């Protein structure tokens, strides 16, 4: 049985609002870099990787784009890229804690907070955003970060069931996988593949104390004495935080800069 997806106008509008925050960014594809070969004795074609192009826009240009989107949607207008807010227990917007802002800005200067209610197709929207970002700007490396294993499995299932739908609409197929510290060949492919690549990771994979969870920060013999986090960071991935209100713990926030995200989208 093949599922049919009806695209809702509000979903398309939400995707365009996010993508329009980078109007003026040049289309760049195939930006290569040398993947750290570790202790490999010989070079190989797989040592060439493809990373996201850096932001070419100035802070002023990005802020102006964001403000245009906010005015279009009748939203409060941000006065700076550091104008971070969150919700209190009554649903009112309040400034974020100083420690949160410090760690967030250490990760990247650009944070896009997209408000969508549960049941409105949020996961569909950010998967579509991935394809639109690739279509308009050439960015191809994405990480979807989630607060739990259950949500991780749900996101992965959504990627599976929408795969044909997005291939039909964009003429491209995304490669996606769940990060597993014992299947690091998938991370190697994430770096070396030129197409759209999506890694799904739950925060326990990098902020917990267990031996398996700490492997992401360790030089591993079975990974040519490299640290997985360094290989991830070299891609300058776009980081999508699904349910970020459940990921505001100190261990998670302090880890975000290590991923070296190009920018962060919060949904």
Regions from the PLM with identified roles:
Residues 1-267:
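RecA-like P-loop NTPase motor core of helicase/translocase proteins
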């Amino acid at each position: 049985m093949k599922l049919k997806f009806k695209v809702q106008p509000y979903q398309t509008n939400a995707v365009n609002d996010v993508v329009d925050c980078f109007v003026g960014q040049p289309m760049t594809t195939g930006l290569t870099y040398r993947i750290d070969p570790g202790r490999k004795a010989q070079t190989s074609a797989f040592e060439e990787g493809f990373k996201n192009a850096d932001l070419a826009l100035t802070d002023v240009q990005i802020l102006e784009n964001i403000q245009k989107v906010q005015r279009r949607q009748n939203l409060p207008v941000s006065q700076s890229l550091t104008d971070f807010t969150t919700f209190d227990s009554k649903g009112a917007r309040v400034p974020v804690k100083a420690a949160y802002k410090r760690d967030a800005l250490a990760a990247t200067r650009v944070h896009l907070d997209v408000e969508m209610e549960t049941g409105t197709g949020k996961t569909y929207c950010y998967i579509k955003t991935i394809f639109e970002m690739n279509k308009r700007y050439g960015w191809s490396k994405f990480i979807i970060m989630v607060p739990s294993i259950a949500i991780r499995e749900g996101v992965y299932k959504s990627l599976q069931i929408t795969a044909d739908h997005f291939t039909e609409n964009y003429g491209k197929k995304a490669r996606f996988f769940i990060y597993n510290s014992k299947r690091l060949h998938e991370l190697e492919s994430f770096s070396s593949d030129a197409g759209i690549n999506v890694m799904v990771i739950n925060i326990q994979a990098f902020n917990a104390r267990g031996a398996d969870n700490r492997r992401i920060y360790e030089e591993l013999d079975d990974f040519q004495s490299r640290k997985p986090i360094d290989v991830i960071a070299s891609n300058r991935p776009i980081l999508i935080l699904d349910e970020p209100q459940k990921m505001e713990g100190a261990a998670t926030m302090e880890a975000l800069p290590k991923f070296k995200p190009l920018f962060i989208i919060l949904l």
